[in-house]
């Protein structure tokens, strides 16, 4: 009888342990298996770079409740005509390019070349041939973020200078993960180099 009781206790204990580990296994699968794997990119300064959000992959927003008649009438009013698109290229006064192209090429090779090519082919980022004066988000075959598509205008030296300080601050939602060039001389040199590239 003592042996039978002992065997019963062992069986109950084993069952409880198996149940516990089964519960832990199911819980961990439900908590962790449905989440996508993520990695955190780190910039040259050692700080984490924020990932961009692909707006196309986001779930559609729920439709809003029916609006009152006054708001509906306002919405039905004709919208202002959209601004015309910028020209494909604008001419840039060479006097506005003040940097050293040779130093800019060196800086480009260290900080930009991993994502941007200068052979007319796209990579992680669009190619930069003819970028000076080109309309934003217009490189054929490159899939731009909605934020960059809405950043309408042309890449003048002044506009590139502002953008290169901090791309994510200038165009929130851009896919470009580069933290920026804080030094004005570096930006001027890179812009001078980019101006030497053919269209």
UniProtKB/Swiss-Prot annotation:
GO terms for molecular function: electron transfer activity; heme binding; metal ion binding. Residues 69-93 are annotated as: Disordered. Residues 69-80 have a biased composition (Low complexity). Heme c binds at residues 112, 115-116, 148. Keywords: Cell membrane, Electron transport, Heme, Iron, Membrane, Metal-binding, Photosynthesis, Transmembrane, Transmembrane helix, Transport. The keyword Coiled coil does not apply. It is a single-pass membrane protein. InterPro entries: Cyt_c-like_dom, Cyt_c-like_dom_sf, Cyt_c_1A/1B. Gene3D superfamilies: Cytochrome c-like domain. The chain crosses the membrane at residues 7-27. Its main location: membrane. One of its GO terms (biological process) is photosynthesis. It comes from the Bacteria. Pfam families: Cytochrom_C (PF00034). Binds 1 heme c group covalently per subunit. PANTHER family: CYTOCHROME C. Electron transfer pathways that operates during photosynthesis. This is Cytochrome c-type cyt cy. The gene is cycY.
